[in-house]
Amino acid sequence: MPQSFSSIVRMGDYILKSPTLSKIAVPVAQQFVKLSGYRQLGLKFDDLIAEENDIVQTALRRLPEEESYARVFRIIQAHQLELTHHLLPKHKWTKPEEDKSYLLPYLLEAEAAAKEKLELDALELK
């Protein structure tokens, strides 16, 4: 069963609140990010979210114009770098402090709206 974005956020919050789970999960997550290499291409984590989902499409339409253009630029630049088998110079890599979620608030908002619409569509009047 596919998970919703809100359930993933709740799971992440739970892991970060638990000291034991946090000691295990945070270093593993940091190593995963380092090995995945998306920051070396100038991408942010939210750039990796698949766009084939209606909720993601809605969230992308709600993005501010400048953030949307920046996202498209990063993705096109990463594709070009991959085609030429190059990486960005180290000073142009996405830094961890720059890799903040810009799409998540819009995803959660779109997911809540879709859930509300589904509930209202299933409403039976007597």
UniProtKB/Swiss-Prot annotation:
Membrane topology designation: Peripheral membrane protein
GO molecular function terms here?
ubiquinol-cytochrome-c reductase activity
Subunit record text: Component of the ubiquinol-cytochrome c oxidoreductase (cytochrome b-c1 complex, complex III, CIII), a multisubunit enzyme composed of 3 respiratory subunits cytochrome b, cytochrome c1 and Rieske protein, 2 core protein subunits, and additional low-molecular weight protein subunits. The complex exists as an obligatory dimer and forms supercomplexes (SCs) in the inner mitochondrial membrane with cytochrome c oxidase (complex IV, CIV).
Q: Where in the cell is it found?
A: Mitochondrion inner membrane
Family the entry assigns = Belongs to the UQCRB/QCR7 family.
Q: This chain belongs to which protein, by name?
A: Cytochrome b-c1 complex subunit 7
Keyword check for Membrane:
yes
The organism named in the record is Eremothecium gossypii (strain ATCC 10895 / CBS 109.51 / FGSC 9923 / NRRL Y-1056) (Yeast)
Write out the transmembrane intervals: none
- Cross-referenced InterPro entries, in alphabetical order? QCR7, QCR7_sf
Functional description taken from the UniProt entry = Component of the ubiquinol-cytochrome c oxidoreductase, a multisubunit transmembrane complex that is part of the mitochondrial electron transport chain which drives oxidative phosphorylation.
Question: What's in the GO CC field?
Answer: matrix side of mitochondrial inner membrane; respiratory chain complex III
Its Gene Ontology biological processes? mitochondrial electron transport, ubiquinol to cytochrome c; mitochondrial respiratory chain complex III assembly
Q: Which UniProt keywords apply?
A: Electron transport, Membrane, Mitochondrion, Mitochondrion inner membrane, Respiratory chain, Transport
User: Known Pfam families for this protein?
Assistant: UCR_14kD
